[in-house]
């Protein structure tokens, strides 16, 4: 292998920038260290609160019940973990895992302030090398996290390994809008308004510019579906929400 091809294989995207793979993790980490304290507020402002509806639908499709063991991966500030903890009850377990300790700290504090103390475990973990045994979880959910992973396929293989047979995968993230007429409006809002909102609230325009760019670099609905199939999952389907701005992919481990 020549040096050029080797270099290309070691590269990935950080927003619209090409960076070395081993650098992306630290760059993404810096973004979320910066935005962690205002993350929930910014989600409400940027989506006009609609992200809560998307997450409710994710929970609805989860098939999680009392006694289940659930992994909320890249779970950040814990929105899904709150709902999962109620579904699994006292005999189940929710593992809230995130590679970023700032986000994990915010999530832990939020859940404890809500009185959720007994059935949620907090673990700092890399999605691409999950520190769990095979066939551990009934359900793994990734909410607005997959696009930030350095190697998405490696993360999906890792998730597949820790899911129980017939366990369910849920991936909630941004997609490509269904209607072309929405693209210009969506781009105008995303590239010109969202970063300014971020700057006003957090005094940090660059982190929110990255978040917008990461959405554009994320695989479209069909591409992600095929990636999930390639990594060993079956019965893969997806649900467009808000005209395809958000998408929930669902799949099962065979």
From Swiss-Prot:
Domain of life: Bacteria
InterPro entries: SAM-dependent_MTases_sf, UbiE/COQ5_MeTrFase, UbiE/COQ5_MeTrFase_CS
GO BP: any one term: menaquinone biosynthetic process
Pfam families: Ubie_methyltran (PF01209)
Gene Ontology molecular function: 2-methoxy-6-polyprenyl-1,4-benzoquinol methyltransferase activity; demethylmenaquinone methyltransferase activity
Pathway named in the protein's UniProt entry: Quinol/quinone metabolism; menaquinone biosynthesis; menaquinol from 1,4-dihydroxy-2-naphthoate: step 2/2; Cofactor biosynthesis; ubiquinone biosynthesis
Record key words, sorted: Menaquinone biosynthesis, Methyltransferase, S-adenosyl-L-methionine, Transferase, Ubiquinone biosynthesis
Reactions catalysed according to its record: a 2-demethylmenaquinol + S-adenosyl-L-methionine = a menaquinol + S-adenosyl-L-homocysteine + H(+); a 2-methoxy-6-(all-trans-polyprenyl)benzene-1,4-diol + S-adenosyl-L-methionine = a 5-methoxy-2-methyl-3-(all-trans-polyprenyl)benzene-1,4-diol + S-adenosyl-L-homocysteine + H(+)
Catalytic EC class: transferase
Signal peptide: none
Residues binding S-adenosyl-L-methionine: 77, 98, 126-127, 143
EC number: 2.1.1.163, 2.1.1.201
Family stated for the protein in its record: Belongs to the class I-like SAM-binding methyltransferase superfamily. MenG/UbiE family.
Known function: Methyltransferase required for the conversion of demethylmenaquinol (DMKH2) to menaquinol (MKH2) and the conversion of 2-polyprenyl-6-methoxy-1,4-benzoquinol (DDMQH2) to 2-polyprenyl-3-methyl-6-methoxy-1,4-benzoquinol (DMQH2).
Protein name, UniProt field: Ubiquinone/menaquinone biosynthesis C-methyltransferase UbiE
Source species taxonomy: Bacteria, Pseudomonadati, Pseudomonadota, Gammaproteobacteria, Enterobacterales
